[in-house]
UniProtKB/Swiss-Prot annotation:
PROSITE patterns: RIBOSOMAL_L22. This is Large ribosomal subunit protein uL22c. GO terms for biological process: translation. Keywords: Chloroplast, Plastid, Ribonucleoprotein, Ribosomal protein, RNA-binding, rRNA-binding. InterPro entries: Ribosomal_uL22 (IPR001063), Ribosomal_uL22_bac/chlpt-type (IPR005727), Ribosomal_uL22_bac/org-type (IPR047867), Ribosomal_uL22_CS (IPR018260), Ribosomal_uL22_sf (IPR036394). It holds the Pfam family Ribosomal_L22. Belongs to the universal ribosomal protein uL22 family.
């Protein structure tokens, strides 16, 4: 049986963030399953560069929830948070004696899904 999306599920997606997926996952693992307010407090205090991008994405997902679905941000929690690897931007850096060194800039795609706390089904 295929389940349909719940009406209270809100998604935000950030693509081509110039950072490796491994570094972004280290921050995402800390906020998965937490409430909206608790997530914002954690992300403000984390010293990692990825926390700024994830903070903006969580804030955007909450704005989507309140504007599009009319949900309250205080009742929402992060039901799904994932980081996938994106394309690798390849460049060449010129070096001495006509040589060149490759530069690889990894990118990642971050997905945040907010859900309403009262819709959490207990099994």
């Amino acid at each position: 049986m295929i389940k349909g999306k719940s009406r209270t599920e809100v998604k935000a997606l950030a693509q081509y963030i110039c950072m490796s997926a491994h570094k972004a996952r280290r921050v995402i693992d800390q906020i998965r399953g937490r409430s909206y307010e608790q997530t914002l407090m954690i992300l403000e205090l984390m010293p990692y560069r990825a926390s700024y991008h994830i903070f903006k994405l969580v804030y955007s997902a909450a704005a989507n929830a309140s504007h599009n679905k009319g949900l309250n941000e205080a009742d929402s929690f992060i039901s799904k948070a994932e980081v996938n690897g994106g394309v690798i931007v390849k460049k060449c850096k010129p070096r001495a004696r006509g040589r060149s060194y490759p530069i690889k800039r990894p990118t990642c795609h971050i997905t945040i899904v907010l859900n309403k706390r009262s819709n959490l089904t207990k099994k």
